[in-house]
Structures are given as C-alpha cells and as structure tokens.
Amino acid sequence: MVKLTHLLARAWLVPLAYGASQSLLSTTAPSQPQFTIPASADVGAQLIANIDDPQAADAQSVCPGYKASKVQHNSRGFTASLQLAGRPCNVYGTDVESLTLSVEYQDSDRLNIQILPTHVDSTNASWYFLSENLVPRPKASLNASVSQSDLFVSWSNEPSFNFKVIRKATGDALFSTEGTVLVYENQFIEFVTALPEEYNLYGLGEHITQFRLQRNANLTIYPSDDGTPIDQNLYGQHPFYLDTRYYKGDRQNGSYIPVKSSEADASQDYISLSHGVFLRNSHGLEILLRSQKLIWRTLGGGIDLTFYSGPAPADVTRQYLTSTVGLPAMQQYNTLGFHQCRWGYNNWSDLADVVANFEKFEIPLEYIWTDIDYMHGYRNFDNDQHRFSYSEGDEFLSKLHESGRYYVPIVDAALYIPNPENASDAYATYDRGAADDVFLKNPDGSLYIGAVWPGYTVFPDWHHPKAVDFWANELVIWSKKVAFDGVWYDMSEVSSFCVGSCGTGNLTLNPAHPSFLLPGEPGDIIYDYPEAFNITNATEAASASAGASSQAAATATTTSTSVSYLRTTPTPGVRNVEHPPYVINHDQEGHDLSVHAVSPNATHVDGVEEYDVHGLYGHQGLNATYQGLLEVWSHKRRPFIIGRSTFAGSGKWAGHWGGDNYSKWWSMYYSISQALSFSLFGIPMFGADTCGFNGNSDEELCNRWMQLSAFFPFYRNHNELSTIPQEPYRWASVIEATKSAMRIRYAILPYFYTLFDLAHTTGSTVMRALSWEFPNDPTLAAVETQFMVGPAIMVVPVLEPLVNTVKGVFPGVGHGEVWYDWYTQAAVDAKPGVNTTISAPLGHIPVYVRGGNILPMQEPALTTREARQTPWALLAALGSNGTASGQLYLDDGESIYPNATLHVDFTASRSSLRSSAQGRWKERNPLANVTVLGVNKEPSAVTLNGQAVFPGSVTYNSTSQVLFVGGLQNLTKGGAWAENWVLEW
C-alpha cells in the first residue's frame, strides 16, 4: 500500500489541514463574524423518551378505545361513526370523543382507510387534517368497487372497535388491530397491528439501519440534522413499508402454508406475496417493531392509511408511486456521470486544479460541486467576490461547459438577516423576501429568527402564496451571475443552530459564528481514520492517536451524572407543541424537538404551526427549487436537484444523498441498505458520500468505496472541511480501481438511462434488492451486502478491510438462472443458496450479468458527452433456455419534453439476435460489435440482415462459450438503430 507519508510528498496533494485557514472565516471584510453564538443557545429541555421512561403510562392499558355505529355502505366502501367507549384517558393529550371512519376501495390493488375527528374548525383543522395542497391523496378509479378489490376490510366492536385488512386470495390478515385499542388524542395517536411470527418489513425511513428491519426496532421518524447515527431518525420522513410473506403452496389451487425465511431451503420451491402500507402523516412519528406486532404512534395528525396489494415487491412499489406519491423525476443523462465535491474548495482555482487532475489521470468527471465555501458570509445566492468572483467564475464555467462538464453549488434552506446597524451588511435576497413577507413567524407575528452558518437567519414560509415565486426569482437572479447546472439543497429539515427565535433582539450581533467549532479550528482538528488504518499505516495512526488524545484532554469537560427530566402533563383542550406530553426518541440532545431545528411553534402564514408539518419543510423546499430551475432554464431543461430532507413524493422533483456519513467501513456497508430503501420510497437518484464525509479516509476504504458507488445511481465523492483530500487521484491504487469500475459504469450508461426512463414512466426501481428481483426465494429476505442494478446486473462488493475475497450468493441457481462473470464472460459455477467465496483483491469488484438479458452499451469516455458519440455494442447473456431480451431508451438527454425519443427492443435466441426500434430520435452512431454469452457451439457463418459478416471479425471461445461479432460498423453506417435488423449465427 502507498503510505500517507508518501502521498504527502506528492506536489499535487493539498496539505492535511486542507483549506481550513481560508475557508472558515473567509468573507468580505464588512461581514467578518465578530460574535460567536453561545453553545447554550442550542441547549433545550432535558426530556426522557417515552420508550425509556419507567414512569410512562401504557396507553393500551389505560385507554378505552372506541365503538363503531351508524355504518353506511356505498359502492366503494363504507363509513361509520366511532365514539369513545369509556371515560377519556387523556394519557398524552386530550381524547377526541367522536371520530369518522371512511373505508374506500380505490382500485383493485389499492384500499384507503381514514379515521379523522368528526368535529373540527379552523382553529384546529391542521392538528388532524393534512391539506391536499401539501400532500395530495390518492384518488379512486372510476371502476373501483368492493367486489373487484384484492383486499377486504372487516371490523368488530369486541371488545372495542378494531379492523382487519384481508387478502382475499389467501385469507391472510395483512393488517389487524384486533385485541388492541385505538387511542386518538390531540397530541397522540396509537394503533397496533399484528404481524406474522417472523416478519419481513422494509422501509419506514429515514434511518441508517439494516435493510430488513430488525424485529425489536424503535423507529423514530422526524427529520433531523444530526449526521448519520445508526438506528436513529435522520433527514427524511417516509412512513411507508413493504411487507413480504413467504409460503409453501400453489397459487393455482389457493394453497398457502406460511414459511419462515430462516427455515427455508434454497433447493425447495416457494412463493411470496407482498403488500405495502403508507401512513399519510407529517407529524413526528414513532414506530415500534415488536414480537408479532407493529405499534404506530404519532404526535398528531390523522389516520390516513393506504394499502397496496402487490403481490410482488415490484408491484407494490409501482402501485405506491403511480397512485399516491408520484413517479420519480427523469434525470438528465449527464447526471449519471461522476461528481466531485468537498467542503474546503477555497476558490475557482481549486476547482480548476481538481478538474485538471481528473484529466491528467484520465478519470471520468462530469460535475464539480462546491459546498458553502463559495458564499459571501455563508449567504445563499451571493458569491464571495474575493475567492469566487463572478468574473472568474464566468471564465471557469465557460471552459468547464466547453469540456462537457457541469457545476453544482450548495443552497441552504435558511437566509441571512442583515445587521440593521451596519449599512454595509445589506443583503438583497432578504430585502426582497421581507418585502413579500414570506418568512416564518413566531406565534406573536414577529419574525422567527434562528441561526445557521451565516449567523442569525430567517426561513422561507412555504405556505405563503408568494414564497415559491420568491425562491424561484432568487435562483433566476443568481443564475445570471453564475451559470450553475443544478442545486444541492441542504439544511432543510429545517435546521437551526439554536433553540427558538434566538436572533430576536440580537441582530446587531450579526454576522455571527455558529455555537460550535468548525472542523479544523483549534479544538476540532480531525484525527479520525477508518477502522483498519492503524494496521496498514501504523506510524501515521500513532501520530493521529496522540493528537486526538491531546485534543481530548485540552477540551475535556465535566458533566453531572444527575439529570432531572421535564415531563409535560396534558392540559385538556390545550396543546404543548414545544414539549409534547409524549416524547419521541428524537436523536437530538435531550430529545427536545426544538434543538438544532426550527421550533415546533414557528408559525406559517395560514396559522399552521411547524409542529403539524415539520416533515414537509424540506419536501416543499425541493418543490420551490424545482420550480425555480424550471424558470432558470425556461422550462426546457430537466431540473437537477439533490436534497437532504425528503418526504413521500420528493422523488418527483429531486434525488437524495445519504447525508453526513463517515469514512468508516460500517458507513459504506449501510449505504447499500439506505440506497435500497430510497428505491422503495421512489427516489432512485440516490448516492452516498463516497469515501466518507466525516473523518479522514484512507487508501483501502476509498479504493473499495469508489468501486461500490460506481454502481449507485448518484455517484459523488465528498468530504468535510480540514480532512485529508480524497479525490480518487490521491492514491495510485485508487486511480486504477476507480478507472476499472468507471469503465463498466460508463459502458452501461445507456442501460442506466433506460432504467431511469422506466422508473419515470412505470414506477420500477433502478437499484434493487435481491429479494425484490427474486421474490420467491425466502433465503434472500435479509440480503443487504449485494444488490442488483435493474434486472440484469448483480454487484457483490467488498465491505470490510484487509480481505481479498468476498462471499456472494447467486440467486436462482438450480432453478434455471444463469450468471456470467462480467470480466471473464464465462458462466458461474455456483450451488443453490450457497454463499460462494469470490476472489476480490483490492481494486476488483465482482460484477455479474444475469442470463436472459441484453445490455446496450457504448464506449467509456471522460465525459458522458464523449461517451454518447461512440459506437454501440450489445452484450447478450443467454438464459438457460437460450433466450434473452433487453431494451434501450434514448432522447436528447435533457429536455423535459423531448421532441424526439427512441425505444429499441432486443430479443435473442440460440442462433439470432433481433433489434426493433420505434421513435423519431436519430441515433447516428453505428453498431460496432455484439457479444453473446452462453453460445454452446461455434457458428459456421454470421449474417446481419442477410449480409455476411467478415469471418475475421468473428471469434468464438469454446471454453467460455462466448461469441464475439465485430466489424459491424460498415453494415450500420446509418446508425445502429436506424432500421430493424437480425443478427444470425
């Protein structure tokens, strides 16, 4: 391995404390921070989470539930009145005495159940009702009826109201509240559903956790700016899950015997049935997975459940996206290239150097990004004119665009509010927003003023009718100064570095330094490295350890071991939104909802408190940014947005990155399950900060991670301020590993793009779990260390240090599936259900092609623009039955409504391959070659539409059974898909 000390000797490597001195406080003189917000400003109340509180009441034990009456049936379902079945328990709020139940069979595969208060008015409607202007509800189809539904609802009043959602085909209860009580209060709702003994649930995000949810998990859902802690609430809110159940039986005769995945035998035949459940709610949530039950708890809102009957996992995802939250946005072709970013690029020259180094080492680069370093005083839409001047930027970006590359800057959710006593501190963006009065308010009507990077800040009120136009206009104004190609929308949970409106009365202290040390400042030098760094870099590790110990000793503080917890006693008819009586296990200090966030009492223009819509802030900001980019590009170019906080449906506007992860092997490991979850949520454009964000990376970790992320839809390297540089050209072995994986990625970009078109038009997934692609194999239910890219490619990455092999399973082997090694093109010899040991030395990532698929490919290049100008190739991997199929979608790669498109279908048999194209997009590049895997005998001749292919261009390997047909350019000069053709051998 190349040691760190050797790397530091290389002239083009930036020193360890990369950019710290310039980037931390580098702003124009009038905006130099002189005041540091005290750390106490972000200290909230000390609360104890209900699940950890020995004094907490169990609502199931003390609440009476409800009784149903006045049932009225209609063609699409029924309604009923629910009345409290006893004395109010008021355990975590005020009981709602009268509820209305609505059951609607919305389509053959979709059912909706609503339970909402019967009596509300304008003063409390937002406590329970989520406006359809914010989150649309799924609509019933014209032909929907009870008789046509896959599902059926039954209910009972014994001992209190409960209901079941039953799959007609099996009689299984997919959702059952039998034996439990419904608790419905103004700040607390609880309902419980039964689950099978050994259940397989996926989703319920956002969390860093196992792909198949643990059966004793406590899942808090409340968007939070808190890095990427394991098993805690993160940035987004996705109260949707997939439930897969396995059976031994026969669909034809209706025989279904439940099977536990842990007891399944890979040599046996099974079937599976999956369904999905979505809770349309934007309040804080807690979902407790227990033995044979799931407990839903919310801090408000209503019960608005939609059930999707599947029965395959792919069906569930399609039903959820097409009917309820919206189909994913179609991405620009170029966004599938490689993206490079870091917090600490100090000026345009730094960016130019990075681009030059990618070219020097011939590593593909599509997008260069900047973090908050470019900003004037960390203000949105305003460049630092000393380091990121508009004139220098225009020159740099012109050259960047000429080279076929692009630029994305970060934009934060908060906006600086200038110092009223400093005329030089003027900020036009704030002035325009204030003129339109589009910022969040305190309950008394004054501005809510929090604190983020620039100091004291205000926050757009997305409920204000002028807010989206204001935001869009700021993007348009800025775009005339900086020719950016997308937006990275951050800090949108929405984050604030203090509790409450801490800037009220303190604006004369602006600009202000955050209440915590920034990376690289004295006391926060980054000494952390990956887990195995001490083994492979002993000298450097010892030095880092000594530095860390010294820093820890210098900054050590004493803490009290005695903690007094604040507990809120419910007041009848009154809500306490800052400290609700029920305390969710929120992963901020003290579990206080106001810590490191805009307070729940911040008020929107329509009177709605942030408490009721907290989960939507980032979602609405993504919509505003999407609308803004439409204006920037005159509704011609697809907006490219990567956002941090997301909600159900955010995928129709943006992609998502995994947040502030760590340069650790465990962080790389969990990136797969996080990506698969976001596939489920309908946000396929997902990627993790490759090589890790927090802490220093090292050669081995970055080597493996650059290869893993090459198969994620969004592929970006990013790290934090003051850590060592980790661009892929920093280590010799990483250069080669990156180029090796990128050669595959860039070759299959047409396949990736086709997958995105299918996701955008049908609701299919791009990155897939093995259990979704092979739904009838229970042994795959928990697999999270390998994954599929579409239906054709399987990736088996190395996820631990100091190894040269990896274990991988080959699904379907023994049941007709054939797998081919990408590199050797030979069929894999594997046994059913066996974790096969695969050679994987550093720099090699095992990749396999599934038999039965045809991949359209082009030659790799340094940019996607260059790659799109290269000849075509096809890789046809024959299945065990000697057939294969595939498809290709093409357009101009960026238009929202392309003037011309092309769809190509490919089919292959044991002796031929056919191409059939439809559409008006003119693809001029010829077909160069076709490779067919699994050809069991050497052909005597090869023809294309009856014309003989020159024998010298045809090779056959009898050992690997690979047929290669080259020399096709002259036969396809008009374009590979200009006419339909058949290749015969």
Swiss-Prot record:
Keywords: Glycoprotein, Glycosidase, Hydrolase, Signal. Pfam families: Gal_mutarotas_2, Glyco_hydro_31_2nd, Glyco_hydro_31_3rd. The active site is at 490 (nucleophile), 493, 660 (proton donor). It is an enzyme of class 3 (hydrolase). Changing residue 929 to M: In strain: GN-8. Glycans are attached at residues 36, 124, 143, 218, 347, 422, 506, 534, 537, 545, 550, 559-562, 571, 601, 623, 835, 881, 895, 899, 957, 970. Its EC number is 3.2.1.20. GO terms for molecular function: alpha-1,4-glucosidase activity; carbohydrate binding. One of its GO terms (biological process) is carbohydrate metabolic process. It catalyses: Hydrolysis of terminal, non-reducing (1->4)-linked alpha-D-glucose residues with release of alpha-D-glucose. The O-linked saccharide is not identified, but is probably mannose. Residues 1-25 form the signal peptide. Hydrolyzes malto-oligosaccharides, but has a low activity toward soluble starch. Belongs to the glycosyl hydrolase 31 family. This is Alpha-glucosidase. The gene is aglA.
